[in-house]
Amino acid sequence: MSSESSKKRKPKVIRSDGAPAEGKRTRSDTEQEGKYYSEEAEVDLRDPGRDYELYKYTCQELQRLMAEIQDLKSRGGKDAAVEIEDRRIQSCVHFMTLKKLNRLAHIRLKKGRDQTHEAKQKVDAYHLQLQNLLYEVMHLQKEITKCLEFKSKHEEIDLVSLEEFYKEAPPDISKAEVTMGDPHQQTLARLDWELEQRKRLAEKYRECLSNKEKILKEIEVKKEYLSSLQPRLNSNMQASLPVQEYLFMPFDQAHKQYETARHLPPPLYVLFVQATAYGQACDKMLSVAIEGSVDEAKALFKPPEDSQDDESDSDAEEEQTTKRRRPTLGVQLDDKRKEMLKRHPLSVLLDLKCKDDSVLHLTFYYLMNLNIMTVKARVTTATELITPISAGDLLSPDSVLSCLYPGDHGKKTPNPANQYQFDKVGILTLRDYVLDLGHPYLWVQKLGGLHFPKEQPQHTVITDHSLSASHMETTMKLLKTRVQSRLALHKQFASLEHGIVPVTSDCHYLFPAKVVSRLVKWVTIAHEDYTELHFTKDIVEAGLAGDTNLYYMALVERGTAKLQAAVVLNPGYSSIPPIFQLCLNWKGEKTNNNDDNIRAMESEVNVCYKELCGPRPGHQLLTNQLQRLCVLLDVYLETESHDDSVEGPKEFPQEKMCLRLFRGPSRIKPFKYNHPQGFFSHR
């Protein structure tokens, strides 16, 4: 036990000469502990220069002590451990000094940053005040300019010349001695003379009105006399009817047409009756006529489907009995197809005349074996149109009536029973025959009173007059709207192909006065080419790029920047707006996938299209969208920040007034144009 206790050494306590003995606490130490100590307050009292000198001195002392410790360890000796311990304690004290200096330095740095932030906030506040003051100055300057440019209404009055005024005006009005030297009094005198002349003319006007009333009374008396002759004329006309019938007068043509209508098949007859009634009641510009051979129609004394079935049965028997006729199987199928797709000899022709003297010629046919109606369309205008290259499909018979109602493209039969008939003769689809037979649109069937239930296919369908009457007015209005819309697009495309975006006077307020970007190319593209573009994948995947739509490519340029716009034009334009997809080639390729501002430009054209419709019926929507696209490109390029590493002036100087160049973390640019102030802002 004694040996173990002797091995345990008590730790040595080394005190400096000036340090107080451990365990003895003086009164002054107790008072200091009661006070609050703060290094942040001490920073304000200390001199940074002296702290720096203390730092250098402490580092030098540490270097010296480390060297001495190294020297003592290398020499060894009995008293070396005590000296090394002494120097170690001194080094610890110096390290504590360095830590304190480090804390003080961090506190000074934080205070410096806080002071810098406060100063920056003050500068930002002053800068905002300066911008507000500049805006107020600009507003006041505009108001001053308006006041200076103000024109009084008396300036719009066309006064007589000075020579005529002093020659004709009485002296009490002209007052030559006063007005000769005073332009203000001269103007007042001329206005007084103008007022006097207008009073005299007003008196003459009242006299003329009284004379007019007298003449109108005389006219009424004569009209009453003439109206008394009407009953006599009617009786004379009634008595002359046998003579008119004997002489075959032209009015008998309508009666003949009604006689011909008796030989129409039921769907065409319903169409003829309802269209004639609609023309007499609502649209005097609608003319209805019947074309075709009446004799051939009379020869159809029995249902053609029965004879066709009998023929098919006899052909089947012949094929079973003999093998020599097998090589003519293709010819037989062609004959069967022709018989299957045979049209009725009579057809109904509707001429729908629009306000601009353009006429839509509709010829309705009835396929007897398929029990469906088809239509062929043709548009004629009062003046011959020069067809642009991009407008080739607008008035083509294959597309002019496509999707008059949504989804009604007229490429397949609306009668479900026809598919079983097609299987017998090897017809895959009716799409291959619509150019010759016409398009079997659903609205055509409804105008003929035909309705085909999809759940229970029926071969024989009864026509319904009420179905035709309920769809007649709506369909006629849609047809007129479609023709006017296509003709408007036809004229616009002629300008677009020459790089001119036609903007009517009613729509000038939608755009700034100066638009630098210009349209350089407008061409039509195929549906396959549109789907292969890399920046149109979103539209294709969303199902908005159908094969019934029309597709175009526009190119807008300004300087080195080129903006491509792929346009999807729905057949229902302008009730359904076009869809634009953009790709900007400037400092790289930018689309809506890698540039939020390109997405914002597409939103301005596609989403905010109602601002660009213009006056009803909105045929200027497409050209207004293209003009808006040119304006958006100007804003995009002019608000782009200038690269300081590039020498020379900015390629696109800012000419548009913008309240704020960027907004939000995505730095969206101000694309909304505010009329009549003329500045751009964010939405």
From Swiss-Prot:
Subunit structure and binding partners: Component of the THO subcomplex, which is composed of THOC1, THOC2, THOC3, THOC5, THOC6 and THOC7. The THO subcomplex interacts with DDX39B to form the THO-DDX39B complex which multimerizes into a 28-subunit tetrameric assembly. Component of the transcription/export (TREX) complex at least composed of ALYREF/THOC4, DDX39B, SARNP/CIP29, CHTOP and the THO subcomplex; in the complex interacts with THOC1, THOC2, THOC5, THOC6 and THOC7; forms a coiled-coil dimer with THOC7; together with THOC6 and THOC7, plays a key structural role in the oligomerization of the THO-DDX39B complex.
Task of the protein: Component of the THO subcomplex of the TREX complex which is thought to couple mRNA transcription, processing and nuclear export, and which specifically associates with spliced mRNA and not with unspliced pre-mRNA. Plays a key structural role in the oligomerization of the THO-DDX39B complex.
Family statement: Belongs to the THOC5 family.
Location of the protein in the cell: Nucleus; Cytoplasm
Annotated stretches, region: Interaction with THOC7: 2-199
Species, as recorded: Bos taurus
GO cellular component terms given for this protein: cytoplasm; THO complex part of transcription export complex
Biased composition (Basic and acidic residues): 22-42
Modified sites of kind Phosphothreonine: 328
Chain positions with Phosphotyrosine modification: 225
Region Disordered, annotated ranges: 1-42, 302-330
Cross-link Glycyl lysine isopeptide (Lys-Gly) (interchain with G-Cter in SUMO2) placement: 153
GO terms assigned for molecular function: mRNA binding
Keywords recorded for this protein, A-Z: Acetylation, Coiled coil, Cytoplasm, Differentiation, Isopeptide bond, mRNA processing, mRNA splicing, mRNA transport, Nucleus, Phosphoprotein, RNA-binding, Transport, Ubl conjugation
Entry keyword Phosphoprotein: yes
Protein name (Swiss-Prot/TrEMBL): THO complex subunit 5 homolog
Span(s) of short sequence motif Nuclear localization signal: 7-10
Keyword Acetylation attached: yes
GO biological process: monocyte differentiation; mRNA export from nucleus; mRNA processing; primitive hemopoiesis; RNA splicing
InterPro entries: THO_Thoc5
